[in-house]
Swiss-Prot record:
GO terms for cellular component: ribonucleoprotein complex; ribosome. The gene is rps8. Keywords: Ribonucleoprotein, Ribosomal protein, RNA-binding, rRNA-binding. This is Small ribosomal subunit protein uS8. GO terms for molecular function: rRNA binding; structural constituent of ribosome. NCBIfam families: PRK04034.1. One of its GO terms (biological process) is translation.
Amino acid sequence: MTLMDPLANALTNIRNNEIRGNVKCRITPASKLIGRVLRTMQKEGYIGEFEYVDDGRAGKFIVELEGNINHCGVIKPRHAVKKDEFEKFEKRYLPAKNFGIIIVSTPEGIMTHKEAKDRGIGGRLLAYVY
């Protein structure tokens, strides 16, 4: 079976394991994009530690869940956003102002929308977490 969107699959896997109350979650296949999104989620306190395991195929991530995620998902289509347009998408994807994060791919790397606003750069919206 081919995956059309591995990032969407990873976030759905995390959300389903959070709902079930599991402590750990396995994400396959692993990719650099998924690893950077996980690092951003970890930095914001939504997940605990995670590690990459090379299984001889595509690899996988083992993620420790903390129970801090109410909902997460990808943003499709991946909107291109200028530095002053983040508020419109905050209203669309997040339940309240200053609650949750939107993960953005920028020329300076993957970061939250708050960091991108502070640095004054735009990018493409990847996912949301709250």
